[in-house]
Amino acid sequence: MARLRVYELARQLEMDTRDLMKELKELGIEVKSHMSYIDEETVNLLLEMYSEEDELEDELIYEEYEEEVEKEIKRKSKEFVEKSEVVKKKKGVIKLEEEDLKLDKFAQKIGIPQNRIIQDFFMKGEILKPGQTLNLQLAKKIAKIYDIKISFEVEEREEKKVNPLEEVERYFEEKYSEGEGLSERPPVVTVMGHVDHGKTTLLDYIRNTRVAEREEGGITQSIGAYQVEVNGKKITFIDTPGHEIFTEMRARGAQATDIVVLIVAADDGVMPQTVEAFNHAKSANVPIIVAINKIDKPNANVEKTKQELVNKINLIPEEWGGDTIVVPISAKKGQNVDTLLEMILLVAEMQEIKGLPDGPVRAVTIETRMERGFGPVANVIIKDGVLHVGDYVISGKVMGKVKALVNDRGERIREAGPSMPVMIVGFEELPDSHGMVYSVESLSKAREITSKIAELEQKELRRKRHMKLEEILKMMEQSDRKELNLILKADTNGSVLALNGAINKLQSDEIKINVIHSGVGAITSSDVMLATASDAIIFGFRVKADSKARKMAEAEGIQIKTYSIVYKLIEDLKAALEGMLEPEEIEEISGRGEIRKVFKIKKVGSIAGVQMKEGYVESDGIVRLYREGKLIFEGKIESLKHYQQDVKKVEAPQECGIKLEAFDDIKEGDELEFYILKKVSKKLNFDEEKGE
């Protein structure tokens, strides 16, 4: 038997890699990681040792069973004693809920008859009524009189503004911290990297689809999720767009993922979006596996790429003494892709990726959109629980009943468990594309939670509207800053968010862009009416305008522009912004000359006899006069003559006569600098870093 890596030996022994590493440590065999080698002699000894242990295992099973039964009896007894103690201690500090602030319930809680409390307070000159609602101050006063200690679980209703979804999340936090009921689930993997480094090609090879061929402009423009099976185990892949414009979408992908595969082209190295993708993974505290792609290319340089990983993002490969798994691959030819998948499963095993298979459902939303024949849908990855057709679900203030579940292969399924990517059909409205989806036990519960969330959002919106009004008034007081109003419609919520982010980068001091409305779906007559009222341009991304909207836009003179490639939309918008600016006047030096002689003419003034040294002078140009290096005059030319003839232009090395407008204090030796003012289209300095 040859030497083996730790994870390879664990596979042969049918053991968990982590357990084997613990066993090796107890045996005094030092290994740094799952990738460490074990020599041949040690491998043989371990194989022999574990085969002997298997023979003894059957004899030990009964003894272990007896021990477990004894432990369970002791645990149950302890729980019974603890519960008894809790009941006895209840007289200490009495915990009160908000509904206990009615006098009758309060009296019952503290063990003092309501009538006695009313009588005692009457004797003190204070009147209380049966069932009266108490405030916190009065409740504490009553408790103090009878020397009773109380504590409140909640604050007063008017101060309480808790989002009900926080309580739902708290349930999952408690379950995870307790560790009970958790079981292994498939890893969710995100492939990230620079544009054209091969993300879609890799996923295409793994899943054997033609996604890469369908994308326009070479950019993946929507987030998708797919599940594959490798060596009997499942892996869920999220495909996130690589172009910088979709930073926000990619960041959401990182939040939903367990492992990141950072793909780097061997012929291109670490690029800006590679660094950006790495930062998303790092900030999300997600383990990273590096796939060095395109090793089949003649100019591929794997070692140089590894060096860039170290120098630019401080990822040190395992073979160089670091802890980053690096796998050279060719996504196009499939070379070493199986090894990459094995490494994903290995890292998943080491990370102990788990979920709650029982109880309520919690899912991460990857994308939402309007789907023909289905209405509002949400693509999600289930994190906890099992979602069934017929379940009630909520996402923010939107609720629904699951009418259908569609998996990544387009098949209708009855249920979806942890780590499964699935499309949920049945929402009443389009849910938020970067929210969570939860299951609830009933329709009434769904309505209760969503109505509370809607109420909280309305309060927040009213507060923000007031702030916006103040900002608008302030802007009206300011000077000539131009504004461009836009209406933005796109095919998916993710595209709307990403394009809003890209447009925000184009804001400048000269022009403000107002996206007065953005949404998902076709351009409608309502959009045109809004554009008419606000003098806006309508931009559509991968959507069309319906016939009614087109006719109305033509009649109202509203411009509708539609695009299927992001770059074109942004470039056209830049051109439109620059077209709104007033042309900029720039100064262009045309020539220089020296006054050789001064002619004083009655009723005319002083005429300069000028020797042109370089360039030219024009009759409608502007001149600066310098004396001993100091600027004495700057103004227009009144007349330009050459041999007594009025001319429009004189070039060096010719001589000419120049009369300056409203200035006669000229001397021999004065130097003249001639320039003209040209109007050029102004260019905006777009803030490319804004919103990153």
Swiss-Prot record:
Its main location: cytoplasm. Residues 239-242 are annotated as: G3. GTP binds at residues 193-200, 239-243, 293-296. Transmembrane segments: none annotated. Residues 184-352 form the tr-type G domain. Pfam families: EF-G_D2, GTP_EFTU, IF-2, IF2_N. The keyword Nuclease does not apply. Residues 330-332 are annotated as: G5. GO terms for cellular component: cytosol. Belongs to the TRAFAC class translation factor GTPase superfamily. Classic translation factor GTPase family. IF-2 subfamily. This is Translation initiation factor IF-2. The lineage of its organism: Bacteria, Thermotogati, Thermotogota, Thermotogae, Thermotogales.
